[in-house]
Amino acid sequence: DEAGAVAALEALASVREGDAYAKAATIFSVYTAINSGDAATLLGKLDPLIGEDGVFTELALELKAQVLARDGKGAEALVVLETLLEREGLERDLQTRAETLRDSLGSGS
């Protein structure tokens, strides 16, 4: 059940006080709710991970672009994707997913 999973992940994130497990739980909670969660809430969870420019930043950028695209903000999603694709050392799988989303948004989909 999506709501239960999100609640459990949010609880884990809150008790871990910002450590790597908390950040991973945050990423997983957004991923779990990406299709139905409130966009502002999801973005509010991702922005701190993006701002810290840490190990989870690239995944947070990818998820942010997906949330924005789902919320009808394709132009904003494209900016986020370009930021992601400009990062050095981007993992190939992540690069491919970002390029695919960028191309689908650029084609008016």
Regions picked out by a protein language model, each given a short descriptive name:
Residues 2-6, 12-109:
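Soluble extracytoplasmic domains of inner/organellar membrane proteins
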